[in-house]
Amino acid sequence: MLLKSTTRHVHIYAGHVVDGEVHPDTETLTLNVDPDNELEWNEAALAKVEAKFRELVANAAGEDLTEYNLRRIGSDLEHFIRSLLMQGEIGYNLNSRVRNYSLGIPRVNHS
């Protein structure tokens, strides 16, 4: 059985991807960030999300691998991504097929 956690911008699978298919593997966690491309990313922001993911996984070491624990990691990552958006490190992709501003209404800076 494939264990997974999916939020709007974070998909975590207990498995590895081969030719676009996820194969269950309880020794490997695979992270897919923003699969709908709702946000505009830069390398620095993605690196921060990946580092936060590694930190959360390390903090959960020793706990059972359950969907609940994966959901907790996914939820924490979703909040972290929202903080990056609120700090202006990432932004909404206005050309995305999905535009529901799920992390909050965009802010416009007036000069």
Swiss-Prot record:
Tell me its EC number(s), please.
7.1.1.-
Provide one Gene Ontology cellular component.
Answer: plasma membrane-derived thylakoid membrane
Any one GO molecular function term: quinone binding
Question: If you read the UniProt record, what top EC class would you report for this enzyme, in one word?
Answer: translocase
Quick one: where is this thing mainly located? Answer: membrane
Its record classes its membrane topology as: Peripheral membrane protein
Instruction: Kindly state which keywords UniProt assigns to this record, in alphabetical order.
Output: Membrane, NAD, NADP, Plastoquinone, Quinone, Thylakoid, Translocase, Transport
Where, per UniProt, does this protein localize? Cellular thylakoid membrane
Question: Where does the chain cross the membrane?
Answer: none
Catalytic activity entry: a plastoquinone + NADH + (n+1) H(+)(in) = a plastoquinol + NAD(+) + n H(+)(out); a plastoquinone + NADPH + (n+1) H(+)(in) = a plastoquinol + NADP(+) + n H(+)(out)
Which superkingdom is the protein from?
A: Bacteria
Q: What is annotated about its quaternary structure and interactions?
A: NDH-1 can be composed of about 15 different subunits; different subcomplexes with different compositions have been identified which probably have different functions.
Describe the function of this protein: NDH-1 shuttles electrons from an unknown electron donor, via FMN and iron-sulfur (Fe-S) centers, to quinones in the respiratory and/or the photosynthetic chain. The immediate electron acceptor for the enzyme in this species is believed to be plastoquinone. Couples the redox reaction to proton translocation, and thus conserves the redox energy in a proton gradient. Cyanobacterial NDH-1 also plays a role in inorganic carbon-concentration.
Please state which protein family the record places this protein in.
Belongs to the complex I NdhM subunit family.
Under which name does UniProt file this protein? Answer: NAD(P)H-quinone oxidoreductase subunit M
